[in-house]
Amino acid sequence: MTKQILYQENARKALEKGIDILAEAVSVTLGPKGRNVVIEKKYGPPQIINDGVTIAKEIELEDHIENTGVALIRQAASKTNDVAGDGTTTSTVLAHAIVKQGMRNVAAGANPIALKRGIDKATQFIINKISEYSRPVEDNKAITQVATISSGNDENIGKMIADAIEKVGREGVISIEEGKSTTTELEIKEGMKFERGYISPYFVTDSDRMEVVQENASVLITDKKITLVQQDLLPVLEQIAKTNKPLLIIAEDIEKEALATLIVNKLRGILNVVAVKAPGFGDRRKSILEDIAILTGGQLITEDAGLSLDKVDLSMLGQANKVIVNKESTTIISNANENNVKARCEQIRKQIEITDSSYEKEKLQERLAKLAGGIAVIKVGAATETEMKDKKLRLEDAINATKAAIEEGIVPGGGATLVHLANDLFNWAKGVLKEDELIGALIVEKSITAPLKRIVQNEGKNGAIVVDEIKNLDFSIGYDASTSKFVNMYESGIIDPAKVTRSALQNASSIAGMILTTECLVVDEMNRNMEVRK
């Protein structure tokens, strides 16, 4: 296919057109009075969306040149979403503002490379200031406020996420499922859960719920296949029978003959036992079994450690406060050795840091979450499929923002933090930078007021007036667009995670700098005649 090549100002202007289109479509959703965007779907009903990155992903323009601009600015939103999970609209608005200001200066003769250096230095200055001003999240109230703001000011969602984090811990898993009613509900699943159920229904102790429930159980954990009870398990089973304690057996597999012996002993009341297959596959299976051993304070019976089943004694077994096994899953609730569990969690965190594989990272995070604090499931309720999708997107944003706040702290929201830091940036840049680098820094100084201006504009008022007013007020004071008043943002609960604000600016300035230093654009040339014939 033939290519179309554009140079210098023509290339930058062509990109700017696409950027303008995407930025306008996304920025209408910003703030408490932001509007929704309706997206036509090829299959199924149209989708009503208030989420910046989802809108950005859906926009494809017919003009290849303009579409390149869309794709570039989309990167800022996507990267912010990957890192912080929220702030995608803010990132798009910031990138658009920096590009617009930068284009004017490049057209007036400024050196794009020097401008980019100034933009990068100014961005780093602001990032350091955000870190300096951020407050740690210390209580449930702050978590509720962050989640409420990020979910589109839905207080019920905010409280639900705060409750979930309180119950499963700050590293616990919060998953979202489609509910079966019109109300959104929170369900907490305590302890460590893995997706393996009982091998036989004959182990069931609660026939109404078809579950095995054991209190104060011993846990035998092995990566071996159990073939014969007499050969493999008899010594330990005799010891367990004397204690009258229930027994959970987790093994690679249990052969029919061994399984039959266990069931007979269970039905005769000699032994309260349940057997499940080990979760996972390959090396991951062994790691998960080691996690379970650490959680319960037991030992993994494996030949690698020189241990065999016929030599097992009671001291090698784990202990669980409660075990619940159904057809599909096993839940172990145990607080046998908290210090060892914490050490294991730290070890998994280090593995997460050094691994490059996103799949491996995801699996390690799952293991960490299961060890660290259990699972919270939010069952989303809605009257229609369209509402369901919108609610799920808002919930995802809220959960991500909350975790980001816990990680790096909080700052005043509603665009106020960046407006307050504009004065600091101006004074610093004037004293440190010169010529085109200074112009680059001042581009950032003007651009970081854009999110607040857009929030006020979406409310139907003049953003420039509000920005000038806020610059002269205390750092904690900002503009509440829902009430049109200047308020203490911390007291009013209008707060943003520092990580979201930082990531939004970092990714916006990175992409904008790349666009400003573009001198040539090569795209596929559209065949106009072919388009007409179609």
From Swiss-Prot:
Localization (cell): Plastid, Chloroplast
Enzyme Commission code: 5.6.1.7
Signal peptide: none
A GO cellular component annotation in the UniProt record: chloroplast
Keywords assigned: ATP-binding, Chaperone, Chloroplast, Isomerase, Nucleotide-binding, Plastid
GO molecular function (one): isomerase activity
Protein's GO biological process: protein refolding
Major location category of this protein: plastid
InterPro entries: Chaperonin_Cpn60_CS (IPR018370), Cpn60/GroEL (IPR001844), Cpn60/GroEL/TCP-1 (IPR002423), GroEL-like_apical_dom_sf (IPR027409), GROEL-like_equatorial_sf (IPR027413), TCP-1-like_intermed_sf (IPR027410)
Catalytic activity: ATP + H2O + a folded polypeptide = ADP + phosphate + an unfolded polypeptide
Binding site for ATP: 29-32, 86-90, 414, 496
The family this protein is said to belong to: Belongs to the chaperonin (HSP60) family.
Assembly and interaction partners: Forms a cylinder of 14 subunits composed of two heptameric rings stacked back-to-back. Interacts with the co-chaperonin GroES.
Function field: Together with its co-chaperonin GroES, plays an essential role in assisting protein folding. The GroEL-GroES system forms a nano-cage that allows encapsulation of the non-native substrate proteins and provides a physical environment optimized to promote and accelerate protein folding.
Protein name: Chaperonin GroEL, chloroplastic
Natural source organism: Galdieria sulphuraria
